[in-house]
Regions:
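Loop/turn-rich, solvent-exposed surfaces of beta-rich toroidal or solenoidal domains
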Residues: 296-344
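Beta-propeller blade signature
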Residues: 194-208, 331-348, 389-401
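Beta-strand-rich domains and repeat architectures in extracellular enzymes and scaffolds
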Residues: 54-88, 305, 313-318
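Asp-box/WD-like beta-propeller blade repeats and closely related beta-sheet repeat scaffolds
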Residues: 134-135, 142-176, 182-189
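Blade-loop segments of beta-propeller domains
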Residues: 97-128, 132, 153-163, 357-363
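C-terminal motif of bacterial Sec signal peptides marking the signal peptidase cleavage site
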Residues: 31-32
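Conserved blade-ending motifs and adjacent loop-strand segments that build the rim/top face
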Residues: 110, 271-278, 283-286, 350-370
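Beta-propeller fold detector
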Residues: 51, 98-106, 147-159, 211-218, ...
C-alpha cells in the first residue's frame, strides 16, 4: 500500500438480468482496456519562434529553479534562481529584458542560510526561499529583506520533516493559505524510510502548523536503501491542475493522480514506447565519473508538466544511452542528458502522442508553458552554436502526428 496506514418467473428474470449484467461488465472492461492503449495522434511541432534571455555574470545556464510569476493584470515574468550567487532574476516575458535582480542575504538579520533550494515567487513582496540546510522556509520581499521564517520540524503525529525545495519539475505551491511542499525519502525514519516516507507536506501559513501527507513513496525501493545509490532512485516530479496533484516517479511507469488532501490516490498507466525495461540500478560504481556516466545512461521517467491552456500533460522520458567515456558527464547531466522524449496525455490521461527529441540539442530540465505552447531551452552545452551568456528557448506546439 502507498497510503499511510420466489417464483419460477422471478428466478428466470434474475437469471436474464445476471447475464445482461455480466455482458455489460465485459463490454465495460473491453472499452476500458482499449481506452488505456496509446493512440499516437499528435506530436510536438517545432516552430520558428525562439526567445533569448541574457544571463547575469553571476550564474551559468545550469539553472535549477525556473518558474513563471504572473501579476493580477496578466503580465508574465520568468523567474530564475542563480546557481552560484544569492540572486534571483526576474525577466519581462514580453521583451525578455531583465527587470530586476533580487539580492538576498545568506547571513545576518536578513540571512536565509548558506544555500537555498530554489524559489517560489508569489508577488513582489512575497518570495519563498526553502533552506537546504535546515527544515525552514524564509519569506523575503523584492528588496531582499527577510519578513518571516517558517520552521517545520515535525507534525502533530510526530512525523519528522526534512528540508524541502522548489525547483523546476517539483515546485512548491501556494494554495489559499497553505504551502504544499515536497519531501524526499526521509532518512530520519531509519529502517522505515523505504516504505513510510511521505511525498510531502502542507504548511498552514496562518497557524504555522505543518502536516505530513498520507501518500507515501511507492514501494519500489529495497529495505536496505541506505546502501550506495546514484541519487536518482527517489527522484520525483509533480504538477497541480487546480484540483488534483499528479506525481511522476523515476522508476515507476505509472502516474499517480492524488487529491489535494493526498488521501485519494489513483494509478494511471503512462508507459513510454522508448523504455523497454525499467529497473532501479543495483550495482553502483565507486568511481565518481563512472557513477555519473551511469546516471546519464540509465532509463527512467522525468518531470510531469501540466499545460492549463490546452488541458494536457507532458511527461519527460529518458531512454537508455550508451555513452563514450570521453564525455563530460557532469555537464551532460546538468544539461538534461543527451536524449529525451515527451509523452503527451489528454485531460483524461490517455496517451495521445510521444515525441523523441534530437540528441544534444534541447534541455529537458529547462522549460515553461504559456498560451503559445511549450518553450524548451536549446542552450545545450554540446550544441555547436551554443552561447553560454544567454538562456534561449524554442517554442513547440502540439499538432497532428505525421
Amino acid at each position: 500500500m502507498y497510503l499511510r496506514r420466489e417464483s419460477i418467473l422471478g428466478i428466470l428474470y434474475l437469471d436474464v438480468m445476471n447475464k445482461c449484467l455480466l455482458l455489460l461488465v465485459v463490454c465495460i472492461c473491453f472499452v476500458s482496456c482499449n481506452s488505456n492503449k496509446p493512440h499516437y495522434i499528435t506530436d510536438f511541432q517545432e516552430t520558428n519562434t525562439r526567445v533569448t534571455y541574457a544571463l547575469s555574470e553571476n550564474t551559468t545556464s545550469y539553472i535549477k529553479s525556473l518558474s513563471i510569476f504572473e501579476e493580477q493584470d496578466g503580465k508574465g515574468h520568468l523567474v530564475m534562481a542563480s546557481n552560484n550567487a544569492p540572486e534571483i532574476y526576474v525577466y519581462d516575458m514580453s521583451s525578455q529584458k531583465l527587470e530586476k535582480t533580487i539580492v538576498y542575504q545568506r547571513e545576518g538579520a536578513d540571512g536565509v542560510g548558506p544555500k537555498v533550494g530554489g524559489v517560489l515567487m508569489v508577488n513582489w513582496d512575497c518570495i519563498y526561499l526553502p533552506s537546504l540546510f535546515v527544515p525552514e522556509i524564509s519569506q523575503i520581499d523584492s528588496a531582499g529583506h527577510r519578513k518571516k521564517v517558517i520552521p517545520f520540524i515535525s507534525d502533530d503525529e510526530g512525523y519528522p520533516f526534512i528540508m524541502t525545495r522548489s525547483v523546476t519539475g517539483a515546485p512548491m505551491y501556494l494554495i489559499e493559505d497553505e504551502l504544499y511542499c515536497i519531501q524526499t525519502v526521509n532518512p530520519r525514519l531509519g529502517k522505515d524510510m523505504a516504505t513510510d516516507s511521505s511525498v510531502g507536506m502542507k504548511i498552514n501559513l496562518k497557524t504555522g502548523e505543518a502536516e505530513a501527507f498520507d501518500f507515501c513513496y511507492p514501494s519500489k525501493l529495497s529495505p536496505d536503501y541506505n546502501s550506495p545509490s546514484l541519487g536518482i532512485e527517489t527522484k520525483v516530479s509533480r504538477c497541480y491542475n487546480g484540483r488534483d496533484f499528479i506525481y511522476s516517479f523515476a522508476f515507476d511507469e505509472d502516474l499517480y493522480l492524488v487529491s489535494k488532501d493526498h488521501k485519494q490516490v489513483r494509478r494511471i498507466p503512462a508507459r513510454s514506447r522508448y523504455i523497454d525495461e525499467l529497473n532501479i540500478p543495483d550495482k553502483i560504481p565507486s568511481d565518481f565519473k563512472l557513477a555519473t556516466k551511469q546516471m546519464c545512461e540509465q532509463p527512467f521517467y522525468g518531470d510531469i508538466i501540466y499545460d492549463k491552456y490546452r488541458e494536457v500533460y507532458y511527461r519527460i522520458v529518458y531512454p537508455r544511452e550508451n555513452l563514450s567515456l570521453e564525455e563530460s558527464f557532469s555537464d551532460l547531466w546538468q544539461s538534461g542528458r543527451s536524449r529525451f522524449s515527451i509523452i503527451i496525455l489528454d485531460k483524461d490521461f490517455h496517451i495521445i502522442g510521444e515525441t523523441l527529441f534530437p540528441e544534444n540539442h534541447y534541455r529537458s530540465d529547462l522549460y515553461y508553458v504559456t498560451s503559445e505552447g511549450l518553450f524548451i531551452s536549446d542552450s545545450h552545452y554540446k550544441k555547436p552554436d551554443n552561447d553560454e551568456d544567454v538562456l534561449s528557448f524554442r517554442l513547440f506546439m502540439i499538432g497532428a502526428s505525421n
